[in-house]
Amino acid sequence: SDAIAPAISAANSKGTPVICLGIKANSGDFTFVGSENYDAGHMQGEYMAEHLEQGAKVLYLAGTAGLQHSADRRQGFQDALEEAGRSDITILADQDGDYVKDEAMRICDAWIQTYAHGGKADFDAIVCANDQMALGAVESLKGAGLLTNAGEILITGVDGSDDGLNAVNEGYMCQTVLQDAAGQAKATHEVLEKLKNGETPDKEIIVPFQSVTKDNVADYLK
């Protein structure tokens, strides 16, 4: 991100250590603690490559245009399909939902007008860059009568939010890619302890994403 670069530069000039949690800066001296957003998208692509039938059609709900993590998640998804040799999968539409549930519902409502006929969807999956948009997609499809049975259309999100995990457990979402907030907090604390002790922390500490599906969701439910 360019937006936080000036603040990092100011801190660097005063000799103040900087930790970037979740978002990398494009310049400056800092320790990054977080997850690789590319990996989240790649996990979504891996799931779809394995579970979608030949010739499947997909709708993609991206995050916010111009944000690197949005681009990384999309790229990871696309690369996973390519690596799996799934050139038969068609991306019917790709639109920015800004990570907002209501915006995702609005977009999905419009997609349904275009890609559903006679009460039947002409698409097999909706891949979303976060859980809120995935939940919006679920509500939109339910409202249109296209998701009367769980799992009719594969819907995946990112975050591993409580609502996302519940939707996976109920079968309305096939996957959420968990962003391990607790793991990131623990890693950040460890960096702070090193700084307090006069040690030099690693420049980058990656906390892996985790793919959550019906097969392992029970391990994550509270």
Language-model segments: residues:
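Local beta-strand N-terminus motif with an aromatic residue
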Residues: 121-123, 173
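Hinge/beta->alpha junction and helix N-cap segments in small-molecule ligand-binding domains
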Residues: 1, 23, 32-43, 60-82, ...
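Hinge/cleft segment of the Venus flytrap/periplasmic-binding protein
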Residues: 69, 80-84, 180-222
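Pocket-flanking alpha-helical
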Residues: 2-9, 100-117, 132-143, 161-169
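Short helix-capping segments at alpha-helix termini
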Residues: 11-16, 81-89, 117-120, 142-151
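Venus flytrap/periplasmic-binding-protein-like
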Residues: 19-22, 128-131, 135-173, 212-213
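Flexible loop/hinge segments that line or gate small-molecule binding clefts
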Residues: 2-39, 43, 50, 57, ...
